[in-house]
Amino acid sequence: VGSEMCIRDSALIIQDMGLFSLIKNHFPDIEIHMSTQASVRNIEGVKYFAKQNIDRVVLAREMNIREIEEICHNCSIDIEVFVHGALCMSYSGQCLMSSMIAKRSGNKGECGQPCRLPYSLLEDNKIIKKQKYLLSPMDLCTIEKVPKLIDAGIKSFKIEGRMKRPEYVGEVVKAYRQAIDYYFDQKNYTPDILQMKKVFNRGFTQGFLFQDYLNLAQDI
């Protein structure tokens, strides 16, 4: 930890409370963010981490906008929410599928993404769907809902960038940055969804955030 802190990160994202205690004992001034892998999805969880002097909580991706708004309006701690990127077929940070199938822990950043593979669906020993992407969620995209996300009280938008190509990160971040700036400048903004689709995606959904339940997986 000591050598890493020489970089002077603006904040560290963690899940392990034991690591949190170690970091705070040695580096009391560093800002700590609780990861989405902690599966924080209610006011009680947020208030608990606030009492532990966590600076920001990244909420679980399975929450909807009304639940998030209630938390933001009843808790003083900064709230961060995933607004764009891959979704997990399980609860974020709680999936054991990769560990069991590929012997790679998704909860340690080594997910083999077996949910992205094709599977067949059987009913009464009869194949009703053959080699379809039944467990592969579409990518979360909430660019059209930026005003509602801001009005909910969210302090930080989280955009997936790990292991993504520079053109993907650049295009997506640029689009959300523009949408946010237009909101605060009180200008009308129509996002160019077609432009965003030019970078890698699995099709777009508004996910659990806006209860887009019928448009979550690719081949359902």
Which role does the model predict for each range below?
Residues 13-14, 158:
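Short beta-strand segments at enzyme active-site cores
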Residues 18-20, 39-42, 62-66, 141:
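Short acidic loop-to-helix transition motifs that present clustered carboxylates
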Residues 26, 30-33, 47-220:
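Surface-exposed amphipathic alpha-helical tracts and adjacent flexible/coil segments at the periphery
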Residues 3, 14-18, 22-23, 30:
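N-terminal cofactor/phosphate-binding cores enriched in small/glycine residues
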Residues 11-13, 45-46:
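Conserved N-terminal glycine/acidic-rich loop preference
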Residues 8-12, 55-57:
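Short active-site oxyanion
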Residues 1-7:
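Short, small-residue-biased leader/transition segments that mark boundaries at the very start
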